[in-house]
Amino acid sequence: MPVTRMTSSYANMKVGRWDISDLVKDPSSEEFSRFLRSIEEQLVQFEGSRQLLRPDISSEEFEGLIHMLESISEKVSITSGHAYLSYYADTSSNEASALVIKMEKLASEISNRMLFFDLWFKKQIDHENANRLINAIPKAYQEHLRHKRLVAKYSLSEPEEKIISTLEVTGIRALTKIYDKMTSGFEFTMKLRHGRKTIEKKFDNKEKLVSLVRSPDGNRREAAYKSLLQVYKRNSGVLGEIYQNIIMQWRDEAILMRGYRSPISVRNIANNLDDATVEALLAACRNNVSIFHDYFIEKSKMLGMKKLHRYHLYAPISNKASDSKKFTYGKAVETVLDSFGDFDPQFRGHAERVFAKHHIDSEIRKAKRGGAFCYSVTPKLTPYVLLNFDGISRDVSTLAHEFGHAIHSMLASDMPLMVFHAPLPLAETASVFAEMLLNEKMAEKMSKKERRILLAEQIDNLYATIIRQAYFTLFEINAHKAIGENNATIDAVSRIYMDNLKEQFGTSIIISPDFEWEWVYIPHFYHTPFYTYAYSFGNLLVLSLYKQYKLEGRSSFVPKYFKILSAGGSRKPEELLMEAGIDISRQEFWQQGFDYVQEMIQQLKALAP
């Protein structure tokens, strides 16, 4: 795709809503109905090709079926994308919610009707003819098709797969939708003490509240956490039961029906990673957690505290409000784009295209989905980015992070839809790298004191994206075992989570009892079990890549880096990274990332007054 370069200044840009009319202009229009009918027509044609599925099918016929399947899938992605983005923009909208249900049912029906092709290739064609077809098809598809054959042993019969696909709409998907609807409607009351008075402040968007856990004011940090955790604890009965049911359904399907080795193996195989690789990653995180214990002890000294409390984990190292810089949205955008441009003009140009297409929703408002994400619908369409921008420095980092995801998608836009998305372990390769570019740019004009503040923020972020995420996965392993095998109660799961926190922080931090309910606040546990280790993987990988970039320089590094990003999901992660000189099967590789973190902590200590 061509790179867009906007010439106007971004300094005066304001937060706003996205324009999703590139997907569907009006879901109630005749035009949209015609679009849905065109999907049905193609689907009937595809179903009629079933007679071609013989062992001796020609490679041309096979490739034609692949392209037909992709054409249908692309149209479904567009209709589903519009429904989801409408819903995320306003989760209280009954129309948007109804459209999501309609599109999910349609997608499930279409998936069921195309299932015969997938199952035929996985289980019914012999090994020799499968390899013949794989070797004859364009290279971009080959690893994906090999992986399909690899996971074939976990596939069930066509009728069984259809039943599972149909039940998902009213099963796990319905449960996560209830979780989203319930939690997005939460209202929070933060209580702040001023002398003998208690002042209450209401929040109807948890992102606004959560941003205060990084406030320079310790009372605000503590009050924000207490308000957040109190609401989730009050609703833990329902939220906990939703989680229990998700785990039982995950276990029933993955272990009892499909025969996976363990609950996490489902995610590992989907990521095209060996269990042993993930185990090595998690072991490295546990072995190096003391690095962050050292940091938390140092941070408590910088904050003038005897010992750091969990409420103050993300406290800025300066408690002066004047040191907590606020950014206008325009300045944040300008800074991020400049950092991208310093690295590579193409990197910046791709990010600018998101603004040119108005594919960003950045304002905070009631009923909008919290957090931030990048949604890539198809290779041909510019990705969509959702933010909840409140002007703190972390929001600027989030902006860079999500635009990194968008750039990753755009660099992979030459890949077919089937292999367009990077696998989870590589999904953070551009987003975290983009954050590091931003940090370097921001440090250029900083004083020693400001660099110290930025460095502490970076280490805080590395804790949050490496150790915290790895320990989330370790918690999930234990929670799935406890619920799946022993029918653990919600209180028992909370105790498992508290034990996890105690190992994670050791004696470096004081943990109050209310944090045992933090787990019901983590949406990844509900939406995508065992997802979070990919953040640990991605961040440690990027630390290695960034080190390589600084050693080699742009001219040598950029082509290799872009090759990784442009591959999308067309290559096995181990093989793709090996070409760049990175062997993720070696324990020493993961240690390099932690050594880099340790260097940063030493730099922080050296900057102390």
How would you name each of these model-derived features?
Residues P2-A321, L607-P609:
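A well-structured
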Residues N12-K14, S21, P27, K122, ...:
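C-terminal, non-catalytic "cap/extension" segments appended to globular domains
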Residues G259, D390-M410, S431, M436, ...:
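Active-site recognition of the HExxH zinc-binding catalytic motif
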Residues E298, M302-P345, V385, H408, ...:
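Long, K/E/R/D-enriched contiguous segments that form extended
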Residues S324-Y329, K380-A400:
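Short pre-active-site segment immediately N-terminal to the catalytic Zn-binding motif
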Residues M418-A430, N461, I490, T528-Y535:
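Active-site metal-coordination segments of metallo-dependent hydrolases
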